[in-house]
Amino acid sequence: MAKEIKFSEDARSKMLKGVDKLANTVKSTIGPKGRNVVLEQSYGSPTITNDGVTIAKATDLEDHFENMGAKLVSEVASKTNDIAGDGTTTATVLTQAIVNEGMKNVTAGANPVGIRRGIELATKAAVDALHEMSHTVESKSDIAQVASISSANEEVGKLIADAMEKVGNDGVITIEESKGIDTSLDVVEGMQFDRGYLSQYMVTDNDKMEADLDNPYILLTDKKISNIQEVLPLLQSIVQQGRPLLIIADDVDGEALPTLVLNKIRGTFNVVAVKAPGFGDRRKAMLQDIATLTGATVITDDLGLQLKDTTVEQLGSAGKVTVTKENTTIVEGAGDKDKIAERVEQIKKQISETTSDFDREKLQERLAKLSGGVAVIKVGAATETELKERKYRIEDALNATRAAVEEGFVPGGGTALVNVIGKVAALEEEGDVQTGINIVKRALEEPVRQIAENAGLEGSVIVEKLKEQKPGVGFNAATNEWVDMVEAGIVDPTKVTRSALQNAASVSALLLTTEAVVADKPEPESNNQMPATPGMGGMM
């Protein structure tokens, strides 16, 4: 396909139009009085959202050059979302402000490379200042405040705070759709994996169709148990001690399964067999997680261990195990606390090093199961459209909360960005580098200005008043009052604010140093319409 090339001012102005079109759409959603955006779907009802990254990803412009500008803004939103999980609208607003000011100066003859250097210096100074003013998350109420602001809903804030209190900061919190209209929280304590009993005759509670084992031994192996003779000596030792047994193996079949069932029915001893969770290398890792949690040794050829030689000392144990048709839950594993902590750190390291989103998700699930449990927020709503919108809000709030736990929080509502302007203004450089610093200084005001304008006020007036206030005091656009933002519970995670600024500055600087843009040349539409057939009386 033929290409079309635009240079210098012509190229930058086209891309700037794309930046403005997308940013103007996204920035209408910022703040407590921000509006929603309706997105057309290829099928089903439209999506109504105020989530910046969702809007950015759904936007494609007709003009190829404008679309490239829009896609660069979309990249800022996506990157911020990947790192911090929230702050995508703030990142978009900052990008537009830096690009617009920068373009004016480049058009007037400033050197874009010098401007880029100034933007980088100013961004570093601002980020350092944000870290200095950051507050550590110390209580459940801090978590609730962060989540409430992000979701614009106090109930959601309390729900997320409850979830994090129950499963810990490293715990897995998943979001599912509820069948009703209410939003609720379910917590699964202990380690749960999606494998159920191999025979329904192993249940101990016929009403609930589940097997409850109190203080059981746990046999872990990656082998298939087909011959009962392989485990007979071990079973005899367990029968003598009168304790139940949970077998987690690659599979239990052949004569072994009916023999175990028969002994269970006769009351010889209480036993439940389940298949090991996962597949391949992930199965080995999960078996080792269970072994660490319960104090067991995995009977595997990798360690040169055989089932026939297994002793009671190689078994794990737990306070309680519940097995249903679909899930197995191990509570109060008897593993060594130091070894569990060591295993947790090992998984955290793997999470930080992996580049695959799928692997990261699976590692986080394993981490949560070792750390104490899984919480499920079941989102309810009256309509499907409202349900989607509410899910987006809760996902953002959850991500923001995790970010706050990680790096702390700063005064919200754009206040922190205005508060760091002093540190940026203290930088003294020459020429175009100083111009770049001034561009960032001006851009830091933009989120507050936009929040005020979305609330129907004059943004510049609010910004000037904010500069007169003491640090930490900001404008509450929901009530039109000046308050101490932290005391009022209006806070943003430091990681979210930092990531928004860094990503906006990075892409903006690249855009300003662009000298040529190459795009596909649109092909002329071929006129393949069939000519009207004569004699049809004009019925075309």
Curated annotation (Swiss-Prot):
- What PROSITE patterns does its record include? CHAPERONINS_CPN60
Q: Name one GO molecular function term.
A: ATP binding
| CDD domains per UniProt | GroEL
Residues holding ATP = T29, I30, G31, P32, D86, G87, T88, T89, T90, G413, N476, A477, A478, D492
Enzyme category, top tier:
isomerase
Q: Where in the cell is it found?
A: Cytoplasm
Task: Give the reactions, separated by semicolons, that this protein catalyses.
Answer: ATP + H2O + a folded polypeptide = ADP + phosphate + an unfolded polypeptide
Entry-linked InterPro entries: Chaperonin_Cpn60_CS, Cpn60/GroEL, Cpn60/GroEL/TCP-1, GroEL-like_apical_dom_sf, GROEL-like_equatorial_sf, TCP-1-like_intermed_sf
Q: Does the keyword Cell membrane apply?
A: no
Specify where the region named Disordered lies, as residue ranges.
520-540
Q: Which Pfam families match?
A: Cpn60_TCP1 (PF00118)
Q: Name one GO cellular component term.
A: cytoplasm
Q: How does it assemble?
A: Forms a cylinder of 14 subunits composed of two heptameric rings stacked back-to-back. Interacts with the co-chaperonin GroES.
**NCBIfam families, from UniProt?**
GroEL, PRK00013.1, PRK12849.1, PRK12850.1, PRK12851.1
Q: What does this protein's UniProt record list under function? A: Together with its co-chaperonin GroES, plays an essential role in assisting protein folding. The GroEL-GroES system forms a nano-cage that allows encapsulation of the non-native substrate proteins and provides a physical environment optimized to promote and accelerate protein folding.
Protein name from the UniProt record? Chaperonin GroEL
Q: From which source organism is this entry?
A: Ligilactobacillus salivarius (strain UCC118)
